[in-house]
């Protein structure tokens, strides 16, 4: 989740997992509400690369070289401070025009790329200027 918000919104959410940073506008509650969109993601090793690994150290074990990412349809995120299940929601008011039957990640993608999301537009404008 932190990588997605940093890449597409130019917002760093790393500290919000544990506390409300004193100099940030984003809260811990917003962190877990956004993280809930990712709670139903599943990963499994790609059968074509079975047994091939990458990385690995004394701190962290090796990971599959290639993983298949899929919508598992199940899973929730528990808020660290409240121990309650976090419901997926956007960090600010947004008119959601997609139906309830749409998977969470698709709703998130729709919000991230919507024309009224000023974070996405400025993130990509800045990224393009950086390449020039």
Where are these regions (language model features)?
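Short, functional "switch" segments adjacent to catalytic/cofactor/reactive centers
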Residues: 38-132
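Sequence context surrounding c-type heme c attachment/ligation sites in exported
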Residues: 1-63, 67
């Amino acid at each position: 989740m932190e990588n997605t918000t940093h890449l597409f919104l130019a917002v760093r959410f790393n500290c919000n997992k544990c506390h409300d940073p004193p100099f940030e506008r984003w809260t811990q509650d917003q962190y877990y509400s956004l993280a809930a969109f990712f709670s139903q993601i599943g990963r499994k090793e790609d059968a074509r690369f079975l047994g091939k690994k990458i990385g690995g150290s004394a701190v962290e074990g090796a990971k599959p070289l290639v993983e298949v990412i899929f919508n598992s349809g199940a899973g929730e995120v528990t808020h660290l401070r409240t121990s309650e299940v976090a419901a997926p929601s956007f960090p600010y008011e947004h008119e959601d025009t997609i139906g309830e039957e749409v998977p969470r990640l698709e709703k998130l993608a729709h919000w991230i790329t919507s024309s009224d999301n000023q974070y996405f537009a400025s993130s990509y404008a800045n990224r393009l200027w950086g390449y020039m």
